[in-house]
Amino acid sequence: MAVCMPKVRVFVDTNVIIESFRTGCWTAICEHFAIETVEKCIEEAMTGDRTDPRYVSVDAEVLNAGLAARHAVGKIDVATLVLEFPHAQGLDDGELHLLAYLRGEGVSEDIPIMLSTADKAAVVLAGQLGWLDFLICLESLVERSGVTRGQVVALAGHYRARWLDEVRVKIRLGVIP
C-alpha cells in the first residue's frame, strides 16, 4: 500500500502567481505542492492595467481553487517587520505582507516551507531573515510538477534557477548587502 506524503508548503508572491497563469502552470504546481499566499498577493494578482499589453488575466476561481490556504496579515506583523528592517518599506505590498506573515508565524528551519518570489528586494530581505535556503524558483516548481518543456521555456529569466542562484551567491558574498 502506497503511503501518501504530505505536499510541501510553498508560499508564493504576486509575481509568481501571475507568471504561473501566463505560462499555464498554475494548476500543475497546485496539484503537486500546497500553494499558499496572503490576501494582498491575491488582491494584486487580480488587479492591474488591462490596457497594458503585458497584462495577464488571472481567473479568480482558478486561483482560489488551487490555493491550499490564503492568509490575512495583520498591521502589527507588517509594522514589526518594517521597524526591524526599515528597507522593507521598499517592497511591493504583496511581498511585504507575505514576508511579514511568514515572520509573524515564526518560520524557521524547524518548519518545512518553501518561498517563491522573483523580486530581488524580497530575496534580499529573505536572506536577512535567514531564509535563503527556503527560496525556490518557479522554474523548479514547474519542472517538478510535470508541465511541458514549452511551459518551462516560456518562463521569464527572473523565475529561473540561474537568476535565483546568482542573487543568493551575491547575498552570501556580501555583494548585495
Describe each region flagged by the PLM.
Residues 2-114, 123-124, 128-129, 136-149, ...:
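Active-site-proximal, substrate-binding regions of enzyme catalytic domains
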